């Protein structure tokens, strides 16, 4: 008689499905993402925005050494959440794929093609023994001949295109903000403010020096990293907006109590 595999065995082997059809190692990899830094991506009428709260855990850390947004090609940029070492491997591979496309075909790779190549790599690591899934989610965005594109990849290799999305520990809260505030006709400057507004809801204090932000505009189609000084201006505007909302909510509460 065939001996049954203990339940605990299903979460040790990456290539074995549980009786419920689950790959536990992939789910554990997703948990690494859920514990990661919060990243927000927004597709605007004239470009795209990425913003990440780097979540500096010690005042002794050199903030400039913590990078969460990476330029892949002239027109493509990616934000990461999850295991830092895994991010380095996939970012290097993405850059390699982008350059190989230029050499082979004499043109820049499209955002969708690059995202699919990265997802193919991620998927392969869920199907072969002797390895583990990447504990990493990526937001891959940029401008190509199809205008602005924004893709999210998860540890299983799944690929979804969004108008606006978030990954990391603050995803549930950030998604609530995006679902209520996002407008397809907003411009990049408004998208930058919305991204930081969403991040402000996921943390006690939003510090400009801890924010990594990049944009790609339709006009230039080139990745542009946003300076700390500019981020600071937007953060101040965001907190003014938050204070105004809180004051309005308090006013409404008082009026309800009076009634």
From Swiss-Prot:
CC annotations in GO: cytoplasm; proteasome core complex, alpha-subunit complex
Molecular-function GO terms, alphabetical: threonine-type endopeptidase activity
Subcellular location per the Swiss-Prot or TrEMBL entry: Cytoplasm
Record-linked InterPro entries: Ntn_hydrolases_N, Proteasome_alpha, Proteasome_alpha-type, Proteasome_asu_arc, Proteasome_asu_N, Proteasome_sua/b
Activity regulation info: The formation of the proteasomal ATPase PAN-20S proteasome complex, via the docking of the C-termini of PAN into the intersubunit pockets in the alpha-rings, triggers opening of the gate for substrate entry. Interconversion between the open-gate and close-gate conformations leads to a dynamic regulation of the 20S proteasome proteolysis activity.
This protein's record includes keyword Transport: no
Primary location class: cytoplasm
Superkingdom of the organism of origin: Archaea
Cytoplasm is among the record's keywords: yes
Keywords for the protein's UniProt record, in alphabetical order: Cytoplasm, Proteasome
One of the GO biological process terms: proteasomal protein catabolic process
Biological function: Component of the proteasome core, a large protease complex with broad specificity involved in protein degradation.
Subunit details: The 20S proteasome core is composed of 14 alpha and 14 beta subunits that assemble into four stacked heptameric rings, resulting in a barrel-shaped structure. The two inner rings, each composed of seven catalytic beta subunits, are sandwiched by two outer rings, each composed of seven alpha subunits. The catalytic chamber with the active sites is on the inside of the barrel. Has a gated structure, the ends of the cylinder being occluded by the N-termini of the alpha-subunits. Is capped at one or both ends by the proteasome regulatory ATPase, PAN.
UniProt similarity note: Belongs to the peptidase T1A family.
The protein's name in its UniProt record: Proteasome subunit alpha
């Amino acid at each position: 008689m065939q001996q049954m595999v203990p339940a605990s065995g299903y979460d040790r082997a990456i290539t074995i499905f549980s009786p419920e059809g689950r790959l536990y190692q992939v789910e554990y990899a997703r948990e690494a993402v859920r514990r990661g830094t919060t990243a927000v991506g927004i597709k605007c009428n004239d470009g795209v925005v990425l913003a990440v709260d780097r979540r500096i855990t010690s005042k002794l850390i050199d903030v400039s050494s913590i990078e969460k947004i990476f330029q892949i090609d002239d027109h493509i940029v990616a934000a990461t959440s999850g295991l830092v070492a895994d991010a380095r491997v996939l970012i290097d591979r993405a850059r390699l794929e982008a350059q190989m496309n230029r050499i082979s075909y004499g043109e820049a790779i499209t955002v969708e093609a690059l995202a699919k190549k990265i997802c193919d790599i991620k998927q392969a690591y869920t199907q072969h023994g002797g390895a583990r899934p990447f504990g990493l989610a990526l937001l891959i965005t940029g401008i190509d001949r199809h205008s602005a594109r924004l893709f999210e990849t998860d540890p299983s290799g799944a690929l979804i295109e969004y108008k606006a999305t978030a990954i990391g520990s603050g995803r549930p809260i950030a998604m609530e903000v995006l679902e209520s505030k996002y407008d397809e006709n907003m411009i990049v400057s408004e998208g930058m403010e919305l991204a930081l507004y969403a991040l402000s809801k996921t943390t006690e204090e939003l510090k400009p020096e801890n924010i990594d932000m990049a944009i790609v505009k339709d006009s230039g189609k080139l990745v542009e990293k946003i300076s700390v000084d500019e981020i600071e201006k937007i953060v101040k505007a965001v907190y003014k907006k938050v204070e105004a909302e809180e004051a309005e909510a308090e006013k409404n509460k008082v009026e309800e109590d009076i009634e």
